[in-house]
Amino acid sequence: MYLKAVESNLVRGNQSLILLPEIALTEEWSRRFFKYFGCRPFIWHSKQSKIQKARIIRSLLSGEPCVLVGARSSVLLPFKNLKLIICDEEHDSSYKQEDGPKYQARDMAIYKAKCSKALCLLISASPSLESLHNSNQRKFHIHHLSNQFHKTQLPSVEIVDMNQSKPSSRTWISKQVFDLSLIHI
């Protein structure tokens, strides 16, 4: 779906960064990229060798058109001509670095895009509360997909007015939710 945005960015001679929440997702994404473009993107994560990392950094600093797919640390890389950042599964808590220097890679991607005058796409089937709030504040724009990627049946959703359905003093969930949870446990 967003491979078209990457393609358009490459045609213009620009660099793209695709952030993924887990290292394990890079291989699947690389295969998808290869199937679409006929070549592999640069891959960045902690398991790459120093030689591989040095080669990638030289390429990024040259400004040559390329696509880098990586885990959260890739947002810290020096791009010379970055014009597109895609943060896939933006809601995922794996984007938060809890040890060492603490940072939220999704938020850094947004800031990096602003500094680079790049487009930043936050992709998620279930956006984070922060992104929904920013959308409500008109800081972000939400684009809804008309077609699902995997054509799965969407779950039914029922909104329970907690003013009408007072929970018991021992719990904070409504009686309807509690009763349904007993059925599905």
Show which residues each predicted segment covers.
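Conserved interdomain linker/interface between the two RecA-like ATPase lobes of SF2 helicase motors
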Residues: 131-132, 139-182
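Conserved RecA-like ASCE ATPase "motif II neighborhood" in helicase/translocase motors
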Residues: 70-79
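Conserved motor-coupling elements within RecA-like helicase/translocase cores
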Residues: 47-68
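Conserved Walker A/P-loop ATP-binding site and its immediately adjacent core
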Residues: 15-31
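Walker A/P-loop NTP-binding motif
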Residues: 2-12
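Post-DEXD/H (motif II) to motif III coupling segment of the RecA-like Helicase ATP-binding lobe
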Residues: 92-152
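Walker B catalytic acidic pair
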Residues: 72, 88-90
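Conserved helix-turn-beta segment of the N-terminal RecA-like "Helicase ATP-binding" lobe
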Residues: 28-49
